[in-house]
Amino acid sequence: MNGIFGTEYTKGLQNGQDDRYVQAVVTLKHWDAYSLEDSGGFTRHNFDAIISNFTFADTYFPAFKETVQQGNALGVMCSYNSVNGVPTCANSFLNSVLRKEWGFQGYITSDTGAVADIYKEHK
């Protein structure tokens, strides 16, 4: 359902009356497995989500994949947290999955301070 909603939302915002131009650029966020602000001494800046490959494929990737491939989303924002010990903004999934497997052609941006978190917060 999230993939369908994301696809239609993206098409509605990006597609204007003239097919030669993008009306707006939709940025999908937050890549990936971002769901914590502050809990038990962890914050979004230092949290490491431990996720299996199955959970990625079953839970986290489908909505992003559908919106990239069917909705032609032109932006993706990586999140503050790490996934399986790798900060999301430095994760090879940005190239191996997003660009190579799914054919994403748009831009990738970080959330505010997420790149600095790579060396300041993630150990």
Predicted regions located by residue number:
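Glycoside hydrolase catalytic-domain context in secreted enzymes
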Residues: 1-123
